[in-house]
């Protein structure tokens, strides 16, 4: 049975929040048509020795927002990140970290999406863009999506 767009987006959200890697991030996500927004609370468990979040946290937020913006368009198979370029522009050591992704181009074989990350004050702290492609793994076979 084919899901509606709304049902697909909610299933993607459930898949993301329930993924084991996100246990320590406790993210909130909202997926829409060609868009995704993700928020996490910054905690010192994400910090490097200099007292700010490690760049991998911001990178993950950028990739995830771009990935789910791209995934919003594909309702039959899992999407894969084939490349992702990021720019980390400001350290973050407290508050909320939010990333907003959007699709910027699509053709038969790939989707290009970008994301911008913001600190709690609304300042840009990073940006990135990536190329996303369809995999062969059907979404219906992924338990966290199918729930």
Regions found by a protein language model. Give the residues of each.
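Terminal targeting signals and extreme-terminal segments of soluble enzymes
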Residues: 1-147
